[in-house]
From Swiss-Prot:
Described purpose of this protein according to its UniProt entry: Component of N-methyl-D-aspartate (NMDA) receptors (NMDARs) that function as heterotetrameric, ligand-gated cation channels with high calcium permeability and voltage-dependent block by Mg(2+). Participates in synaptic plasticity for learning and memory formation by contributing to the slow phase of excitatory postsynaptic current and long-term synaptic potentiation. Channel activation requires binding of the neurotransmitter L-glutamate to the GluN2 subunit, glycine or D-serine binding to the GluN1 subunit, plus membrane depolarization to eliminate channel inhibition by Mg(2+).
Alphabetical list of PANTHER family matching this protein: IONOTROPIC GLUTAMATE RECEPTOR
Name of the featured protein: Glutamate receptor ionotropic, NMDA 2C
GO biological process: brain development; calcium ion transmembrane import into cytosol; directional locomotion; excitatory chemical synaptic transmission; excitatory postsynaptic potential; glutamate receptor signaling pathway; ionotropic glutamate receptor signaling pathway; long-term synaptic potentiation
Site (Functional determinant of NMDA receptors): N612
Amino acid sequence: MGGALGPALLLTSLFGAWAGLGPGQGEQGMTVAVVFSSSGPPQAQFRARLTPQSFLDLPLEIQPLTVGVNTTNPSSLLTQICGLLGAAHVHGIVFEDNVDTEAVAQILDFISSQTHVPILSISGGSAVVLTPKEPGSAFLQLGVSLEQQLQVLFKVLEEYDWSAFAVITSLHPGHALFLEGVRAVADASHVSWRLLDVVTLELGPGGPRARTQRLLRQLDAPVFVAYCSREEAEVLFAEAAQAGLVGPGHVWLVPNLALGSTDAPPATFPVGLISVVTESWRLSLRQKVRDGVAILALGAHSYWRQHGTLPAPAGDCRVHPGPVSPAREAFYRHLLNVTWEGRDFSFSPGGYLVQPTMVVIALNRHRLWEMVGRWEHGVLYMKYPVWPRYSASLQPVVDSRHLTVATLEERPFVIVESPDPGTGGCVPNTVPCRRQSNHTFSSGDVAPYTKLCCKGFCIDILKKLARVVKFSYDLYLVTNGKHGKRVRGVWNGMIGEVYYKRADMAIGSLTINEERSEIVDFSVPFVETGISVMVARSNGTVSPSAFLEPYSPAVWVMMFVMCLTVVAITVFMFEYFSPVSYNQNLTRGKKSGGPAFTIGKSVWLLWALVFNNSVPIENPRGTTSKIMVLVWAFFAVIFLASYTANLAAFMIQEQYIDTVSGLSDKKFQRPQDQYPPFRFGTVPNGSTERNIRSNYRDMHTHMVKFNQRSVEDALTSLKMGKLDAFIYDAAVLNYMAGKDEGCKLVTIGSGKVFATTGYGIAMQKDSHWKRAIDLALLQFLGDGETQKLETVWLSGICQNEKNEVMSSKLDIDNMAGVFYMLLVAMGLALLVFAWEHLVYWKLRHSVPNSSQLDFLLAFSRGIYSCFSGVQSLASPPRQASPDLTASSAQASVLKMLQAARDMVTTAGVSSSLDRATRTIENWGGGRRAPPPSPCPTPRSGPSPCLPTPDPPPEPSPTGWGPPDGGRAALVRRAPQPPGRPPTPGPPLSDVSRVSRRPAWEARWPVRTGHCGRHLSASERPLSPARCHYSSFPRADRSGRPFLPLFPELEDLPLLGPEQLARREALLHAAWARGSRPRHASLPSSVAEAFARPSSLPAGCTGPACARPDGHSACRRLAQAQSMCLPIYREACQEGEQAGAPAWQHRQHVCLHAHAHLPFCWGAVCPHLPPCASHGSWLSGAWGPLGHRGRTLGLGTGYRDSGGLDEISRVARGTQGFPGPCTWRRISSLESEV
């Protein structure tokens, strides 16, 4: 009875105080009741200081009411709250709920649903048990729900890759919801969670301890997630310690329910226990109450600004509850969106904060709760690893199941990425890893590490090892170096972390070598690697001088400055001193354009041969010069072939890849010998640099200035052309080549490896983990797991085997250099052109005519003669190419003989036809000169051939005559009959008149008659003064006559179709005219022809050649009548009868013009034909008496050439013979022609 009067008197006094405030003031104020769930000293002190002056900074006037409730009796609690609501006009209630006041929270939720009064829980103790709340309840909580706590706990598990765990619960209310939430979060996550076991224990007073021990000993998991109250948690951890589940090798995580108050944790709580609490876990009671009152005041003020009045106070509990009024619903909606002091206090429809800020706390070795992480805006930030070994001092603690692993970022073995910005977690197939940094939380705490996500080949190996060997780990990235190098006696990198026992294990692209093996233990290699070289394909952009790059500048200079000049001078010198070619009389030349082979023509010839240029050139005539030109032509072929073969590699750069045979290749050992110098490097402080420094010191000295900071920098330098080759681990380079965008990077030799080694896991010396890890790695190799991982991580779409040449079009960038050269040449040509005109029109007229400047004229003439050449008067004019189609008779006979040769099958006749064909071709090979005038017989007086004065009398030669002492005259073939009427020609002067006596007259005197009388100069029948175009047959030094050269095919005129069609008609006409003598009527030899009187010419007037029939014409040799070759006398007689002028033009020439068919006036002829005097060659037909027996007439043998050479030289010097003629024996078929 007395117990019930105390609260009643208290409420009565409160209501009296409230009524004394006056109505005027109450209308503008807001009444808030603050209910404390306990009567401890802190609550008593705060209740004494809680006054309206504590809330002056709020927009409304607050009238606080403090109430203390008895939590042991729910009925008394209900009576007190309902009496308060009925006596005072309360707008809202702020309730301090501890974790042990779940019954109070349920009663408050029921009262709110009945009276619609807003109730705000500020400590979060009721958040675990109030799921869901009553319908129509306005109960709001600043704590977090069980689902939100589970979400943070799973993020912690994911942070350290604790994917395997077991769940332990008690029979505390809500344990079924907890298990359901665990399964829901695990199923919704992308992480492959493994729920090893679920155990529900009776942890209350008097529970079966033996059963609890047995169930706990059956658990085999590194991580445990427990759900129970604080009292039950003390019992659970005591039993777990006895079962061996508490210690550094096990991790325990509990929700906020198991912690209770964070002021003094129980002694049974293990070190390293992890839990999740709200950010207000360190706030005082005054700050919590102030936040709750501020939320109610700000919501009411928002309602007042919109509606102009405050909401009505709450109703009485004893009144039957009706529907919620619109004003109450509006006021509740304003409470759901409140911001206070920069914090968002937005509530969900379930009454929980939408974006709560939570912290992860852990019990450190000093048995104090320490914040190790923060959950903010859906992202978890870990301050540093939660394991107690990683306290602020980072002092390591011995642990048999948890390892610290150091690694280093290097693709594809370890790839580091940033967490997902939306969730703050790592994406699938990645592992959280940390790196030292200076990150600062919003609360002002400094995080010494930054959370990152690691993946790659080595990370997958580590995850498999942790699953098989059964250990937990946390991963961090080294920042004090690379793989590991000893610098000034101190090891850095991953090796240094293991050596100085800051890490239990190091995994990554860590090469096994002897120096490292002395201080740490390595596992068996899990990847085979070595040293390889990477180069870049060309991107197709070439320099303007790419067309010059197939040869070095030294080769170009040697080619065009040295070789071309030296060979040109050599060819010129050989030609200069050749006895048959060069005109050495340059200085006396009077006219340019002669056939002289100059130094300029030599350079032009060699230049044309180099570039296969079809330009008009003049070839040398000397044998030695020709050999030199042929050797130069062969050299030019090799030069052009080598240039063309290498040009494509420089014009199409994407097809070019540098190749090296190994580290001992000359490109690495002698890089300065290359053009340009070969540039290569590596990443320092690694095994690759150590290997090169130890074995190739000169190579290492050169590559130091090209070393790169990282692999990514090296790849960029290769693509930009700053580096020619990059030397590094083969496994890394193969991955980079396979994943390169555009496949621009390749490793030489399809991934050829030098200094083969492997990657291993580094552990501390004599580590007990070595054997287990070696067995696991060998198992992975045997099961094919390693090969699968290599396929995933170490292969790419770009393969080194795809090095076939890809054809592509050349664009303007490839050919820019050639166009630039052409433009420069055009510019230089314009400058030379302008200078030429300036000199010709201006400068040369300004130079005064002075004898002092004659040296300039001589110098200019010398340069011009050197490059153009001159022709002296002694040089014979160049002969024109013969025209075989000028005489239709010759063409007809030539075609006839060719057709006859095709029809003849016998070898002898065919050979005769060949010789006859050459004979006909030789007829047209002589120079066509104007014919001599027909001359009368000797009895008719002076010769009317040329109207020139008689030469002065000269002494008669001493002796001259035919070889046998008679009057036989050897003449050449008779001229052809004219094809058209002769045309008069211009008169010519007597060019045969010389002031000195010819040498041949003094050596061989001419005599005639039977008495041996010497003929005077005017009586000589063969005077050289009557024939202006003569020829003399000459022989070589062996006695064989020179054969005339046949015209080249390009000199022959082309026959049209109408001329070719006449072939058959010409053949018929050639053999059908007149009677053809049979072969039996022809003489078998020349001697037989002279033995027959009828074969002698009729021109002889002596008695021995008279005929009974008085026939005046000599009998012609048997030939085709289509030729109709008359003897010279007939031609002369026909010319006189026709009244032709003295000059017969174009058809009848001197006897030497057709000098291939010999005729002879033998010894029986007393007189020679008068016109034979025009053939000056007759003077040399007979030599001295000592040579007469060997002179070739129509007799037996060949003429000795002993005196013919000199006769030929004299004749050329006086008459200017146009060319040599040939004397040879003729066959019967040729004589027939």
